[in-house]
Amino acid sequence: MKKVLALVVAAAMGLSSAAFAAETTTTPAPTATTTKAAPAKTTHHKKQHKAAPAQKAQAAKKHHKNTKAEQKAPEQKAQAAKKHAKKHSHQQPAKPAAQPAA
């Protein structure tokens, strides 16, 4: 790889490839008599993966309500019924007068 890169650089500089090849062959190659220490055995540690939480809607992530398990949803009402609460009168309807038995 280095030789290829050097050839490209030499060609870009305008040097002849023959002169460049002569320079590279005269450099001594590293001897194989040197021994390298064996690389230490690496241990791979596995990460503990947590269970993925259940997916929630975006609004549910932001707004946490304290709701009871048995709380019922309120009845749906018309918009006018929400605005105008009716007042209940506590008057009982008048009873007809009792007729004496004849």
UniProtKB/Swiss-Prot annotation:
Locations listed in the record: Periplasm
GO biological process, one term: response to acidic pH
UniProt biased composition (Low complexity): 21-41, 91-102
Keywords: Periplasm, Signal
Lineage: superkingdom: Bacteria
Post-translational modification, as annotated: Proteolytic processing gives rise to the active protein.
Family affiliation: Belongs to the Asr family.
Entry-linked HAMAP family: Asr
Name of the protein described by the UniProt record: Acid shock protein
Organism: Escherichia coli (strain K12)
Gene from which the chain derives: asr
